[in-house]
A protein has these predicted regions:
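Acidic active-site catalytic centers that drive phospho-/nucleotidyl reactions
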Residues: 144, 175, 200
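N-terminal auxiliary segments of SAM/dcSAM-dependent transferases
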Residues: 44-131
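Class I SAM-dependent methyltransferase SAM/SAH-binding core
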Residues: 184-204
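Conserved class I S-adenosyl-L-methionine
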Residues: 170-179
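Intrinsically disordered, low-complexity terminal regions of plant proteins
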Residues: 2-46
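Conserved alpha-helix/loop element of class I SAM-dependent methyltransferases that forms part
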Residues: 152-169
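Class I SAM-dependent methyltransferase Rossmann-like catalytic core
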Residues: 136-155
Length: 204
């Protein structure tokens, strides 16, 4: 589906994407510098609590956490605003996943209960988490590029995961926690003769 985006919406998306990039390339290095300069205060094998206490002394770290949290909120607001205007058309398109001629199929099990620890926390502050919104997959897909400074525009992360599996004559492959299928699809390309299953709590 060709999702329609106005010039104003595209400009806002590009602006928020740029902020995400600045968080990684501008603020991130300042956090690294602080840690490298101050880690001498830690013991040889610091635990997470000790490292957290040290980093909480860093202005860059505290500002970076504030900056990223609010930038995420702006990105979700932007993407949801675009999708909500075309909600019926987008959902109708998503519901065509099992039409004749499609590669593979989707089966949803309404008996599966979402675990409390998963249901009660909005992972990456995504509204509705990954299971509570019909647009969860699209939001992830649109956000991963800016979040990774466009280092995943060709699904490099999914391919790295799939290529990390020792090569073999696999008959069946199960991708646990498949999300939107970033590694599931590469498995299909790498092992075209195998049966590939992707399993996730959330609908795609």
């Amino acid at each position: 589906m060709d999702i329609q985006v106005t010039r104003t919406e595209q400009a806002k998306y590009d602006f928020v994407s740029g902020l995400m990039g600045f968080n990684s390339t501008g603020i991130g290095p300042a956090m690294v510098d602080f840690y490298e300069n101050e880690k001498v205060k830690l013991g040889p094998n610091p635990n997470l609590a000790e490292t957290k206490a040290l980093m909480n002394q860093s202005t860059a770290y505290k500002f970076g956490a504030f900056f990223e949290y609010n930038d995420h909120a702006m990105m979700f607001e932007t993407v949801l605003g675009i999708l909500d205007k075309q909600k019926d058309d987008v959902i109708e398109w998503l519901d065509t996943c099992n039409e004749a001629g499609t590669l593979g199929s989707l089966t949803l099990n309404s008996d599966v209960q979402t675990p409390r620890y998963y249901k009660n926390v909005e992972i990456h502050t995504q509204p509705g988490n990954y299971h509570g919104s019909a647009f969860a997959g699209l939001m992830y897909h649109w956000m991963i590029g800016p979040f990774l400074c466009n280092r995943d525009d060709n699904d490099e992360m999914g391919w790295d995961l799939a290529n990390g599996i020792p090569k073999g004559d696999y008959k069946k492959i199960v991708d646990l926690g498949c999300g939107i299928g970033k590694s599931t699809i590469p498995y299909c390309d790498l092992y075209p003769e195998a049966e590939i299953y992707g399993i996730d709590y959330a609908s795609p």
